[in-house]
Amino acid sequence: MLGKVYIPCAGTARIEGSIGSLIAISLGIDQEATGRENIYIRGSLLGLKKQEIEQKIGQIIELCDLGSFIDLPIRTYSTGMQMRLAFAVSTMIRPDILIMDEWLSVGDESFRSKAESRMVDLVNNAQILIIASHSKELIKNTCNRVIWLEHGKIKMDGTPEDVLTAYFG
């Protein structure tokens, strides 16, 4: 609902601010299009205008480190290359509200450190982070408020320390 994929069954949802989601980061990738073309395709699906994509394309290409492969069809990429491109494009957004399902960690060891730095920057620049996670460390390190949901209902709302203690025992 927060990602505007579903509408409420009852009541209304009022969301103030831009929303970005890091769920399904490969959504919209066209296997026949080049990496460069996919940057524009995926960027537009993320709500970016062509001019915004053009301002960020150099940064995206540098992050995904695909070299001349950027102008080849995605179908010629390894799975790791596809994930690096999808990650680089998906993390070019700067939303007020960031929705994540766990922490993204993609690629080989050298890319992982760049990806980690990008994720920290993205999370730090969001006004609100909504993350679904069972990782005690991740929640402790990124959240200042935790809401424990059970069967769609709020079971507990409080500080990370209080909620994590109740959840994990």
What is the predicted role of each segment?
Residues 157-158:
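ABC ATPase "signature
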Residues 112-125:
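Helical segment within the ABC ATPase nucleotide-binding domain
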Residues 40, 52-69:
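Conserved ABC ATPase "signature" region
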Residues 1-43:
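ABC ATPase nucleotide-binding domain signature region
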Residues 151-152, 167:
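Conserved ABC ATPase "signature" C-loop
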Residues 139-141:
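A short, surface-exposed alpha-helical micro-motif characterized by mixed small hydrophobic
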Residues 133-134:
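H-loop/switch region of ABC-family ATPase nucleotide-binding domains
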Residues 91-100:
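A short, proline-enriched helix->beta-strand linker immediately N-terminal to the Walker B motif
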